[in-house]
């Protein structure tokens, strides 16, 4: 997966890895205003669980991809194609990623509002 993505994204540590690796999206954010959060939210529109964001803290705009050892080659190839599509979207239509996810039940929440005014209980609907 790392080898398929390193032509598109900057790999933070270009070393042999067992299964996890870290991408730095610092250049993508600087040149196209697309953050690691935007790419992670874009993953949701393709049915992929977003990777770990902003960790490790020493890598700017970090995305840590760590597929499990049970993933098939086909699913890893599919994930690579999705990350490549997200990269191309970042270059050609960054606003689409700023609004992602758009195909999910819940779209992108206002994270500042959620942090400042958390709703800590769930109101169940009466059947």
Where are these regions (language model features)?
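Non-catalytic terminal extensions of PLP-dependent enzymes
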Residues: 1-127
């Amino acid at each position: 997966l790392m080898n398929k993505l390193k032509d598109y994204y900057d790999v933070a540590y270009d070393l042999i890895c067992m299964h996890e690796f870290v991408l730095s999206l610092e250049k993508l954010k600087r040149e196209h205003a697309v953050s690691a959060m935007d790419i992670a939210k874009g993953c949701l529109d393709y049915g992929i669980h977003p990777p770990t964001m902003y960790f490790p803290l020493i890598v700017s705009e970090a995305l840590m991809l760590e597929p499990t050892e049970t993933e098939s080659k086909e699913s890893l190839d599919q994930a690579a194609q999705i990350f490549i599509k997200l990269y191309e979207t970042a270059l050609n239509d960054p606003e689409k990623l700023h609004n992602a996810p758009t195909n999910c039940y819940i779209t992108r929440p206002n994270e500042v509002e959620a942090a400042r005014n958390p709703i800590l209980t769930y109101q169940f609907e009466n059947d």
